[in-house]
């Protein structure tokens, strides 16, 4: 068996086409979704990522702006900028690019975003709504993972899904989404004993720990679906996933590559959530 390659770039391209059509329909009603991104400092990777989000938003007809603040900007001034965006009726969605400089509390900033504009889905209010099954903004990488799984030809109901990693950004929220899809979910982490036995029983494996080579062919049962969220640069700057792709694809039923798997969908879901934010505040289904 050679696995089906779950091409995140193509899935993302198709999904964005649908978003573009919805944006055009909104514009006909007189509304244009706008994404505002706060970037503090000059971290090269962050700048590149923010520019990718801006470009992607504009390509589907949204307005996007980058609010670029100096590295030494005080927490108070970041909060002031955030307050301005919270109260700007033209802004549909806000996200703050992390990491932030040491003088700025990430938690304090994330909690200061208007929950109705929190397109990253990191505000405690939105996290809480996710866990009681209310409509809310779901973190973008987990949302992207679920979209990828739709293309994996697997009915998640009753399946054993194993998530490696318990972060608030990926591991925990994707576990909740898998539960909502009626999968039986196990979360593995750094204190888990005998990780192999859990993995070997899994119909679906989502690995999100940033540990290259963690999942090998011996860990995977034949036909399992593998979603690799890891993206750790090696000494040459090449991105490596958590999964040994070349060997695992020989036994898996479907697998995401790194790069080109989950990454493109993460940005796509930022756009999805920005569109959702605009629709919700305008009372449009």
From Swiss-Prot:
A Pfam family of this chain: THF_DHG_CYH
Enzyme Commission code(s) on record: 1.5.1.5, 3.5.4.9
GO-annotated cellular components: cytosol
Molecular function (Gene Ontology), one example: methylenetetrahydrofolate dehydrogenase (NADP+) activity
GO BP terms, alphabetized: L-histidine biosynthetic process; methionine biosynthetic process; purine nucleotide biosynthetic process; tetrahydrofolate interconversion
Record-annotated disulphide pairs: none
Quaternary structure note: Homodimer.
Record protein name field: Bifunctional protein FolD
Gene: folD
């Amino acid at each position: 068996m050679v696995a089906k390659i779950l091409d995140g770039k193509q899935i993302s391209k198709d999904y964005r086409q649908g978003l573009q059509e919805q944006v055009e329909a909104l514009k006909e009603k007189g509304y244009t979704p706008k994404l505002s991104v706060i970037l503090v400092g000059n971290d090269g990777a962050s700048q590149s990522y923010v520019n990718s989000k801006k470009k992607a938003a504009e390509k589907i007809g949204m307005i996007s702006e980058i609010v670029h603040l100096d590295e030494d900007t005080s927490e108070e001034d970041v909060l002031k900028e955030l307050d301005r965006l919270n109260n700007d009726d033209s802004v549909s969605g806000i996200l703050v690019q992390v990491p932030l400089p040491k003088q700025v509390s990430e938690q304090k900033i994330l909690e200061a975003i208007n929950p109705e504009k929190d397109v990253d889905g990191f505000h405690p209010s939105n996290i809480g709504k996710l866990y009681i099954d209310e409509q809310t903004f779901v973190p973008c990488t987990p949302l992207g993972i679920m979209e990828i799984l739709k293309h994996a030809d697997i009915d998640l109901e009753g399946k054993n899904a194993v998530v490696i990693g318990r972060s608030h950004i990926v591991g925990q929220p994707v576990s909740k989404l898998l539960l909502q899809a009626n999968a039986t979910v196990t979360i593995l982490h750094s204190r888990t004993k005998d990780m192999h036995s859990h993995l070997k029983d899994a119909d679906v494996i989502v690995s999100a720990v940033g540990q290259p080579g963690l999942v090998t062919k011996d860990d995977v049962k034949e036909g399992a679906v593998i979603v690799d969220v890891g993206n750790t640069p090696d000494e040459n700057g090449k991105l490596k996933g958590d999964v040994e792709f070349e060997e695992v694809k020989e036994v898996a039923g479907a697998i995401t590559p790194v790069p080109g798997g989950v990454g493109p969908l993460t940005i796509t879901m930022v756009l999805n959530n920005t569109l959702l934010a605009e629709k919700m505040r305008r009372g449009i289904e």
